[in-house]
Amino acid sequence: TEDGRYHTIYNSNDGYPEWQKVDYYDDETDNYLQINNQIVVSHRFNDRWALNATGFYTYGYGFYKQYKDDADLCEYLNLPAGPTADVSADLIREKIMRNHLGGLNASAAYSVRKLDLAFGGSWSYYTCPHWGTLDWVSGMEKEQIGGRWYDNDVDKHDANLFARANWSVAKGLRLFADLQYRYVSYQAWGVNDNYVSEEVGMQPINVDKQYHFFNPRAGLSYTLADRNEFYFSFAVAQ
């Protein structure tokens, strides 16, 4: 303190050498925008049939800027092999992402006497490109900096179908069954922000996977004298 006033290491000159003084890049902030949209439809046709459906779409966009001191330029610029690849400089980098998620959920229900049926499905699609740019490099003009230093994208499709039944066989005895099929497709490509070596450059991404799942479930329940309930089920989950 000095005259009752406190100072931080960032603005105090009380014996700190220049190399210990710290400053921060003012624009290093996390920024993210998300917009959610939904359309919901619910309709009962009669005492037996009902329908529910929901369509949705979500948009997202985010970025942050970061100051890097004495960064290796080979991790950001396409430099020729040799001594020039070891050049370093101060720079400001920006990482950006944009995502889209859309889909539909729908189901129908049917009830008659002692039987309840439900069936439906859903589908969704998700994509989310990521990329990075350089806003500024010390000692270089803007046109010398080039384009994106990493760039990748991902696509995901997710769909499922289901059917469900509940049947009151007798007083206190109910049987139920539930069947679900799910399909997932996932692709990713491009390069991420991890530098591997001078020969490889940024780490490559190459994923192409498809998955199929079938999840059956069945069982019964029995209520005795309105006080005791016995329950048995069998299921397979994937």
Identify the function of each model-found stretch.
Residues 190, 200-209:
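Outer-membrane beta-barrel domain signature, especially the mid-to-C-terminal portions
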Residues 31-196, 221-225, 229-233:
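Face-selective signature of the C-terminal outer-membrane beta-barrel domain
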Residues 24-26, 92, 148-149, 204-205:
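Short, contiguous strand/loop micro-motifs
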